[in-house]
């Protein structure tokens, strides 16, 4: 590969630091950039949770210093608020369960950052995602199935992938950490972030309550129609949720209850048995799907979930998906990504599901 001018997105974690290091090793002209995405005072606390804290910015700068590359911080907080946070709140308010990491990749890392990078004369953007990218732009799973991130990249458009580089796709997480230690990077043992980066407390329900205020309503049994209790905000629930329903009494048959449906218009949360969560078909919107005719493939509906055989048919700007096996606890708003083996075929956002 010829020498390129490369922008390395550095989150302050071990993956992005090693990805930047490998770009340097490849002979590219590398500049590091950290994205300032949050203006919450909680993100500036030492030990704050998430992935865009002041401590993360410092870790990214230290890694850039070790690598001997220029380093900058880009303030994208306003666009992140509009494109990711506002939509996250709107989705929960509408009874959907969003994946903000997917949205961030679509609208921030491979849109806002990519646009600015190309305008500044960079040839590509390097990130620490665990995924592989063929020379023809085909996205594939990482060799490390436990850390594979192709799912959160599966709705990127071909033109976005064309300017992306994922140097870690052929390495396991253990190998990445070992390499970071050999290179003297202080983030070698830094824990992975598992929280929603802009919810510093880690309590999504409480965070939404601050934004949306109380919206009380009933918790209703799907089988009997009985009102079992009250809640102060349907947005604090997700389809498939079992704990924290606040019912105070078990079902007559002793079976646990799960959230089956959220109705924002009436602020009603409907609960019932786990069997009612099984869905065998779905409709996807906001699709990336460059294929004709029905396609037999596998579908993944969770970032760390398994795949199920599926037949996908394009109908205008939506996809009709028939599943060979039921998926349980899947909600509208989640991403669905389709695979042929380890090759990503495309994806979209789930609009609706049916049994």
Swiss-Prot record:
Which parts of this chain are annotated as the region Interaction with tRNA? 147-149
Q: Which cysteines are joined by disulfide bonds?
A: 104-197
Q: What is its EC number?
A: 2.8.1.13
Q: Name any one GO molecular function.
A: ATP binding
- UniProt cross-references to Pfam families, sorted A to Z: tRNA_Me_trans, tRNA_Me_trans_C, tRNA_Me_trans_M
* Compartment(s) of residence: Cytoplasm
State which gene encodes it: mnmA
Q: Does the keyword Methyltransferase apply?
A: no
Tell me which species this is from: Parafrankia sp. (strain EAN1pec)
Q: What role is this protein assigned?
A: Catalyzes the 2-thiolation of uridine at the wobble position (U34) of tRNA, leading to the formation of s(2)U34.
> Would I find Mitochondrion among this entry's keywords?
no
Q: Where is the signal peptide?
A: none
Instruction: Write the protein's name.
Output: tRNA-specific 2-thiouridylase MnmA
Catalytic residues at 104 (nucleophile), 197 (cysteine persulfide intermediate)
């Amino acid at each position: 590969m010829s020498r390129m001018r490369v922008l390395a997105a550095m989150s302050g974690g071990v993956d992005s630091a090693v990805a930047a290091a490998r770009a340097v090793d490849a002979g590219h002209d590398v500049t590091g950039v950290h994205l300032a995405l949050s203006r919450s005072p909680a993100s500036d606390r030492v030990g704050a949770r998430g992935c865009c804290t002041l401590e993360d910015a410092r870790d990214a700068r230290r890694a850039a210093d070790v690598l001997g590359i220029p380093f900058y911080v880009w303030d994208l907080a306003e666009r992140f608020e509009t494109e990711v946070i506002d939509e996250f709140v709107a989705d929960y308010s509408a009874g959907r369960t969003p994946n903000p990491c997917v949205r961030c990749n679509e609208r921030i890392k491979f849109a806002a950052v990519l646009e600015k990078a190309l305008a500044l004369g960079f040839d590509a953007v390097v990130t620490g995602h665990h995924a592989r990218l063929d020379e023809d732009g085909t996205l594939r799973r990482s060799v490390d199935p436990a850390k594979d991130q192709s799912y959160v990249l599966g709705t990127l458009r071909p033109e976005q992938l064309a300017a992306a580089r994922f140097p870690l796709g052929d390495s396991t997480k253990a190998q990445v950490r070992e390499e970071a230690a050999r290179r003297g990077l202080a983030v070698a043992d830094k824990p992975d972030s598992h929280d929603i980066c802009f919810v510093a407390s880690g309590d999504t329900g409480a965070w939404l309550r601050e934004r949306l205020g109380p919206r009380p309503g009933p918790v209703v049994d799907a089988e009997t129609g009985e009102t079992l209790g009250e809640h102060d905000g349907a947005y604090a629930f997700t389809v498939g949720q079992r704990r924290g329903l606040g019912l105070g009494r078990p079902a007559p048959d002793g079976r646990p209850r799960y959230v089956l449906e959220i109705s924002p218009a009436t602020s009603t949360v409907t609960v019932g048995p786990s069997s009612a969560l099984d869905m065998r078909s779905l409709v996807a919107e906001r699709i990336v799907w460059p294929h004709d005719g029905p396609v037999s493939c596998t579908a993944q509906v969770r970032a760390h979930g398994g795949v199920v055989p599926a037949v996908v048919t394009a109908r205008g700007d939506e996809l009709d998906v028939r599943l060979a096996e039921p998926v349980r606890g899947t909600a509208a708003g989640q991403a669905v990504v389709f695979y042929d083996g380890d090759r990503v075929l495309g994806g979209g956002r789930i609009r609706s599901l049916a049994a």
